[in-house]
Regions:
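Non-transmembrane, aqueous-exposed alpha-helical and coiled segments at domain scale
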Residues: 1-205
Length: 205
């Protein structure tokens, strides 16, 4: 069984991932695991958006889990150690916003499925009538949607001088980065033009 080739205690969190499901654990987290052998800054804070059951087993195992790789020659096992923290978003959204606003975090990635973007797929626009969006606009300090969380974190980075952020949509959406940028910018403009302007120059999607 292959094990991490780095000191777990030396790893910092440079990535926050929203939607810690099987796809991310088998792909994005593995790429980060490969990188950590050379650069300890890119540990992951993995976030479950819907249920604590997605993160409870990982938390009990210090973030470690085993990936099975199958090919015609057989099956190999690998322990992945890149997930250094776990969070349940509805449990403490303010803490999650602070985590994404940490200046040591440079990347937020997402696998929240198409429905998780609270948008109209036909137009690519934010659905302002969506219950989660309405909640977030009324309670911006305690967002529940991915768009609201991103906007809150970007606003916190703006206010604290934490710097720019790279936001990477890993879901199967046409023009996913451009769509997500439009959603977050639209939401931000509804709240404050200053935030929307800051996002235009300090966030990459």
């Amino acid at each position: 069984v292959a094990r991490p080739r780095y000191d777990l205690a030396s790893i910092g969190v440079g990535i926050v991932h929203l939607g810690l499901g099987a796809f991310h654990r088998a792909h994005g987290a593995v790429y980060a695991d490969d990188l950590l052998a050379r650069d300890p800054r890119w540990g992951i804070c993995g976030v479950s958006m819907k249920t604590p059951r997605a993160v409870a087993p990982l938390a009990a195992q210090d973030g470690l889990y085993t990936l099975l790789l199958k090919d015609p020659s057989g099956t190999t096992a690998r322990v992945v150690g890149s997930v250094r923290e776990t969070m349940f978003a509805p449990g403490d959204p303010r803490a999650l916003v602070r985590r994404m606003a940490d200046p040591r975090v440079h990347v937020v990635t997402l696998t929240v499925t198409e429905k998780g973007y609270c948008h109209d797929p036909a137009t690519g626009r934010l659905d302002l009538a969506h219950p989660d969006v309405r909640h977030d606009l009324a309670h911006p300090g305690e967002p529940v949607s991915a768009v609201g969380l991103l906007a809150a974190a970007l606003d916190e980075r703006r206010r604290t001088g934490a710097g720019a952020l790279n936001v990477v949509c890993c879901d199967n959406l046409p023009h996913n980065g451009r769509v997500l940028e439009g959603l977050v910018s639209s939401y931000a403009a509804t709240r404050t033009p200053e935030l929307a302007n800051w996002i235009a120059t300090h966030a990459a999607f």
